[in-house]
């Protein structure tokens, strides 16, 4: 019978499918999530790197264990005290083999040490030995490689706690070793033991669970025994009263709970099929699929809807049924439902509930969208599950596209051939094609902002990470046009200001492309206006992310030339008078703009700007002539008397 173990651990629950992988979530500063990073926190489940054929998992204080179907063990996370068992004290962000182990049938991770149960009924252990956690009589402070627990055989179940361990023997008794200052060895003493000692008075034991400093045993009749630390009432010792007689009256006074107990005592709960022990709380799974909890509730880990406090009375976890397995972490709790989903409650600042938030929860909440889960494990501040492999996205190319969608995006990663859906944020991809286990091609849907590209498999959805980002780039926007008007003949250099102008592929004045353009920056383009028809047009800029929308700030006006004054406006008939012409729509420079005095053309025409030109008058007969400005094929309209010149 599998059971949940511990504080900083959990029990190794058995799983089935040979292709099963592991998901992890929560705190990761020591690499205990096994995803190849030490990204501090993951608030939703993500895949542990490179694991398949997993049958059981266990989570320790800052390390994790996985049992494979071939009877070997993988470990990852903190290794300062050798708890990974690979002969070093170097931590690992990905699973590594525990050398020399084979025929393993169960694993259990304590706070800073590890256990493995072999098929021959013996137990191997490694990691810290400060309090005799290795149980081998070994006098050193740690072992970086597995050592045999001394004098132990016929073991059928193991559970590693904060700094002690429990084992269930095939004859229905239980044994313990390690720290004992709180009575957690259950042998009637409060002393540590470097070798296994019998837990006093227990028979017909079917499962054991080691918590932070307390132990639980499930008996064959469905009852539970507890021992060890009781500072948060985690032993579930029933309340007792003493009788006080004063002046003929009888009073009942509640007796204080003991701080600990070195021998097992009964917990008032029946019909139990599994037990789990956290740092300072305890759990029992009933045959009805309900869960009972008692002990410390400072982080809402009892799941009964209350916040804070503690209780020695087992109470039902709110709204939970159909549970098939339970797991107690340090101050959080997990439950596996019959449909393969996971619920969690309690402490959550580090994301160990897996629901995408950092808020504690006094009632069960879903751990993301995990599905098909077959086993769960709760560590000090992280969680694990076994089930169909999750995908991991490691790259997105291109990493940006238009808000209108439609871009073809190559997604790289792991287990992508198992994909049943691809999402850009909350929106499904327009379509996707599985190219290989490491590549998917997807069509980006419409969207805005920066989103995570996620892959859904039978096990759930890939965890968001820094490499799965896709940015929806807005189309360019024009905020300013300088100058706002120019001659219809074209050829004017226009400065276009705005946003998102980098990478421009086209600039148009109305429907006509600019003669040329230069992208100065993401906020500026210089464009040469094409010839146009007198009147306003909208300038537009096109980039790979779309075309700028029409606004009042992109208006450019093509002007016919006008004459508003001639200075002087009279001169001798032989010509040669230098005249300054004021108006608009002139082409700066020499040669583009001409002026007609009647039918005769002025000479030496130079336009200093679009509003001022100088010229020399041709010869003319005495009288008044209309002057016309011509820019290319465009001719100014009559505007007497401002455009009239008098020959004297």
Kindly label every feature range from the protein language model.
Residues 444-450, 530-535, 618-623:
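Surface-exposed, short loops/turns at beta-strand junctions within beta-sandwich domains
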Residues 1-5, 10-391:
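Eukaryote-biased RCC1-like beta-propeller repeat architecture
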Residues 388-418, 460-503, 546-592, 634-648:
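Beta-strand/beta-sandwich contexts
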Residues 416-429, 500-514, 586-602:
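Short, surface-exposed alpha-helix to beta-strand junction/turn motifs within ectodomains of secreted
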Residues 70, 171, 288, 339, ...:
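Residue-level detection of beta-strand-connecting loop/turn positions
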Residues 89, 190, 358, 431-435, ...:
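Short beta-strand segments within Ig-like beta-sandwich modules, predominantly Fibronectin type-III
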Residues 438-442, 523-527, 611-615:
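Short strand-edge motifs at loop-to-beta-strand transitions and within beta-strands
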Residues 455-457, 541-543, 629-631:
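Conserved structural position at the C-terminal beta-strand
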């Amino acid at each position: 019978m599998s059971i949940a173990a511990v504080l900083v651990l959990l029990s190794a629950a058995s799983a089935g499918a040979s292709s099963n992988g592991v998901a992890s979530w929560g705190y990761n500063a020591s690499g205990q999530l096994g995803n190849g990073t030490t990204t501090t926190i993951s608030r939703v489940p993500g895949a542990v790197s490179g694991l398949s054929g997993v049958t059981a998992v266990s989570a320790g204080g800052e390390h994790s264990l996985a049992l494979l179907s071939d009877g070997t063990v993988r470990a990852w996370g903190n290794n300062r005290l050798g708890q990974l068992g690979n002969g070093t004290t170097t931590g690992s962000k990905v699973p590594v083999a525990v050398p020399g182990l084979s025929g393993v049938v169960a694993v259990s991770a304590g706070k800073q040490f590890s256990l493995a149960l072999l098929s021959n009924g013996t137990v191997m252990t490694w990691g810290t030995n400060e309090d005799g956690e290795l149980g081998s009589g070994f006098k050193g402070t740690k072992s970086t490689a597995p050592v045999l627990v001394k004098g132990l055989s016929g073991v059928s179940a193991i559970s590693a706690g904060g700094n002690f361990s429990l084992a269930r023997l095939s004859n229905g008794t239980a044994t313990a070793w390690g720290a004992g200052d709180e009575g957690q060895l259950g042998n009637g003493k409060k002393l540590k033991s470097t070798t296994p000692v019998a837990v006093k008075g227990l028979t017909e034991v079917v499962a054991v669970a080691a918590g932070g400093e307390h132990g639980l045993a499930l008996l064959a009749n469905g009852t539970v025994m507890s021992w060890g630390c009781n500072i948060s009432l985690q032993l579930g010792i029933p309340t007792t009263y003493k009788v006080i007689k004063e002046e003929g009256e009888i009073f009942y006074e509640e007796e204080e709970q003991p701080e600990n107990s070195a021998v097992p005592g009964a917990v008032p709960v029946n019909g139990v099929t599994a037990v789990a022990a956290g740092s300072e709380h305890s759990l029992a799974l009933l045959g009805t699929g309900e869960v009972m909890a008692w002990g410390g509730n400072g982080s809402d880990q009892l799941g009964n809807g209350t916040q804070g406090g503690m209780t020695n009375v087992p109470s039902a976890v709110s709204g939970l049924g159909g549970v098939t397995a339970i797991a107690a972490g340090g101050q959080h709790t997990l439950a596996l439902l019959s449909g393969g989903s996971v619920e969690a409650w309690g402490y959550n600042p580090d994301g160990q509930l897996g629901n995408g938030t950092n808020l504690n929860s006094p009632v069960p909440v879903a751990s993301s969208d995990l599905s098909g889960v077959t086993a769960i494990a709760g560590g000090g501040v992280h969680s694990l599950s076994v089930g169909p492999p999750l995908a991991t996205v490691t790259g997105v190319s291109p990493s940006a596209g238009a808000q209108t969608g439609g871009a073809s995006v190559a997604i790289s990663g792991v287990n992508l051939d198992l994909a049943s859906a691809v999402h850009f944020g909350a929106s499904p991809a327009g379509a996707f094609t599985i190219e290989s286990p490491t590549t998917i091609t997807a069509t980006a849907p419409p969207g805005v902002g920066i989103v995570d590209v996620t892959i859904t498999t039978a096990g759930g959805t890939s965890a968001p990470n820094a490499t799965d980002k896709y940015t929806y780039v807005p189309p360019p926007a024009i905020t300013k046009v300088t100058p706002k008007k120019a001659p219809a003949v074209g050829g004017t250099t226009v400065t276009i200001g705005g946003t998102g102008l980098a990478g421009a592929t086209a600039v148009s004045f109305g429907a006509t492309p600019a003669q040329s353009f230069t992208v100065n920056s993401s906020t500026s383009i210089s464009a040469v206006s094409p010839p146009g028809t007198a009147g306003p047009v909208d300038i537009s800029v096109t980039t790979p992310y779309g075309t700028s929308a029409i606004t009042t700030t992109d208006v450019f006006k093509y002007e016919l030339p006008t004459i508003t004054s001639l200075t002087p406006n009279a001169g001798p008939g032989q010509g040669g008078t230098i005249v300054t012409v004021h108006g608009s729509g002139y082409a700066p420079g020499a040669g583009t703009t001409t002026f007609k005095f009647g039918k005769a053309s002025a000479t030496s025409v130079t336009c200093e700007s679009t509003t001022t030109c100088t010229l020399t008058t041709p010869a003319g007969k005495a009288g008044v002539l209309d002057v016309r400005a011509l820019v290319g094929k465009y001719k100014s309209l009559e505007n007497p008397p401002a455009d009239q010149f008098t020959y004297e």
